């Protein structure tokens, strides 16, 4: 996990000890778990800094979109419409009003915040059990700003594992052979991309295959 540091783990309590929510992936006809992915809050100074370096207007929202997309494509989770959220992201991260999240039928909630610390990207996130009104997990990461998508994948892995008991697969990369050029003179190149198709890069020039 080069250039990526897990700063701290506040706590992870086994769900069976508290009777918290779990996703049973062994059952057939599984109904996706309703989960609210709150946009990661960010202070104005950090927002301007990352907008300049990453060309992203709101990097906190971009990271939350990665998490939301990952959870949705897994088929096990149903990310809820953000327009229905009743609590501001920064307030929800500190102390969720669980009655508000219950009102929109969320069973789990992800909150977080982003900050520029010495030109590094620091991301904190928390996973909450809405039904039990308890925090299930809290983690923080510090990395170079360009790793923002990977942070989203790692957070999804942690959430997926916590709720299903299975290892996540979102922070993985795929190596494949890409072809281009006319049919009579195809060029094959070795390429790599994230599991969601982002960050596609060629590893060879086409002369090696």
Predicted segments — roles?
Residues 118-123, 182-191:
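Structural motif
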Residues 1-4:
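Positively charged n-region of N-terminal signal peptides that target proteins for export
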Residues 148, 162, 207-209:
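Conserved beta-propeller blade repeats
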Residues 24-97, 110-114:
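Short beta-strand->alpha-helix linker/helix-N-cap micro-motif
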Residues 111, 174-179:
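Residue position within the beta-strands of beta-propeller blades
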Residues 12-16:
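N-terminal signal peptide c-region/cleavage motif recognized by signal peptidases
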Residues 193-209:
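Multi-bladed beta-propeller domains
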Residues 21-22, 92-158:
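Amphipathic beta-strand/beta-sheet edge segments enriched in Tyr/Trp
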């Amino acid at each position: 996990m080069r250039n990526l540091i897990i700063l701290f783990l506040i706590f992870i309590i086994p769900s069976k000890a508290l009777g918290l929510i779990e996703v049973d992936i062994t059952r057939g006809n599984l109904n996706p778990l309703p989960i609210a992915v709150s946009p990661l809050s960010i202070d104005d100074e950090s927002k301007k800094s990352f907008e300049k370096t990453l060309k992203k207007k709101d990097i906190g929202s971009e990271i939350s979109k990665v998490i939301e997309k990952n959870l949705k494509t897994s088929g096990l989770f149903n990310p809820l419409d953000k327009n229905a959220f009743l609590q501001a992201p920064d307030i929800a991260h500190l102390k969720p009003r669980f009655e508000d999240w219950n009102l929109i039928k969320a069973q789990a909630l992800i909150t977080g915040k982003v900050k520029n610390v010495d030109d590094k990207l620091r991301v904190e996130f928390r996973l909450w059990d809405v039904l039990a009104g308890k925090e299930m997990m809290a983690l923080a990461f510090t990395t170079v700003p360009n790793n923002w998508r990977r942070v989203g994948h790692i957070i999804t892995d942690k959430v997926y594992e916590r709720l299903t008991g299975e290892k996540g697969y979102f922070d993985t990369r795929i190596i494949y052979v890409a072809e281009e050029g006319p049919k009579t003179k195809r060029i094959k190149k070795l390429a790599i991309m994230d599991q969601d198709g982002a960050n596609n890069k060629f590893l060879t020039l086409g002369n090696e295959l």
